[in-house]
Amino acid sequence: MTIQTETSVSAPDLTYSKTRGLVANLSAFMKQRKMGLNDFIQKLSANSYACKHPEVQSILNLTPPQDVELMNSNPSPPPSPSQQINLGPSSNPTAKPSDFDFLKVIGKGSFGKVLLARHRSDEKFYAVKVLQKKAILKKKEEKHIMSERNVLLKNVKHPFLVGLHYSFQTTDKLYFVLDYINGGELFYHLQRERCFLEPRARFYAAEIASALGYLHSLNIVYRDLKPENILLDSQGHIILTDFGLCKENIEPNGTTSTFCGTPEYLAPEVLHKQPYDRTVDWWCLGAVLYEMLYGLPPFYSRNTAEMYDNILNKPLQLKPNISNAARHLLEGLLQKDRTKRLGFTDDFTEIKNHMFFSPINWDDLNAKKLTPPFNPNVTGPNDLRHFDPEFTDEPVPNSIGCSPDSALVTSSITEATEAFLGFSYAPAMDSYL
């Protein structure tokens, strides 16, 4: 990534100049959003100018504790069978790819795709996340995939978390059969509208906070809240998805040290590679709320070194076009010292009792009795208007609906199969499908 310092250019119309600068920032922001944290750090470290910055040097050179589960950006060959970990017992489900008609690509990630699929026996629609085992093993991410599965199994009863119907695997792929949500990513709607009015932002923030509070009650820290991971359902309610970076078994006073997340939303303590706790999720909620109100994350800069420095050192700047309650909430959530951050003492209870949420009846919110401020107006499962054409225009790979011929199964595929023992899951027969 090229580090550039923007120069001031005089313009006769100050309003136009500011607008042009905002559009340029938004354009750069959209291009960088799909970059993974590892790629981001690699490009940052490869830039000689950025590496001279003291805060960047601190980020790149700090050595984490030995027990830290670091995300390894250096590809390595799949481990040998003797190094495989049995990642949990499970029943052997009867599900297989040929049970589905795979209709459209509706999302993409580092390890595979998300597809709209229709089950052939009952014609119900699902979002099926299909991941390549070899790609996961190459980056040593099998623990994160199993963590996602485990978290999904715990989320089936919460209204604002995507539900897992079942999971299964073939010799070379993993399949998550998930709720199909077609109201679009929050990121997609922010791209189109740039920012939201405060009542709409409050509604979304409340539903997000409810979902995070539920995860925390299960001792799960989400760690990757961003508009791309927040979906709208067909009525306009929030659905949180993508649990690959969740950390399980974090007690109320517990901490972890894994360096992971999305660059624009990393809390200061994560950047410093210090132990962090549940309050990283409240920092991210503040960042997303700020973005909903203003159009960009709070400390965003096209200069990557400057952005990290802003997160660590720059005071929060709030424009006057929001209420005092919104200002107070953002100041509490985006507190750089986690011990002073809103939510540090009493977690979700502090958030929902904040005056910004005083118009919210939380019981009605969780019962979905509150009318969403925006209705996606989808006409049915085949209505894909809120998905990015970059995805939906892509052809569905033929390999998605089948497994390798048994005669062509290689040793690496065999090792991949052993790495994901316990992945497959099927519910009790009376709830199956």
Swiss-Prot record:
Protein name: Serine/threonine-protein kinase Sgk1
SMART domains linked to this entry: S_TK_X (SM00133), S_TKc (SM00220)
EC number per UniProt: 2.7.11.1
Name of encoding gene: sgk1
Domain of life of the native organism: Eukaryota
Main enzyme class: transferase
InterPro entries reported for this sequence: AGC-kinase_C, Kinase-like_dom_sf, Pkinase_C, Prot_kinase_dom, Protein_kinase_ATP_BS, Ser/Thr_kinase_AS
Any Gene Ontology biological process: neuron projection morphogenesis
GO molecular function, one term: ATP binding
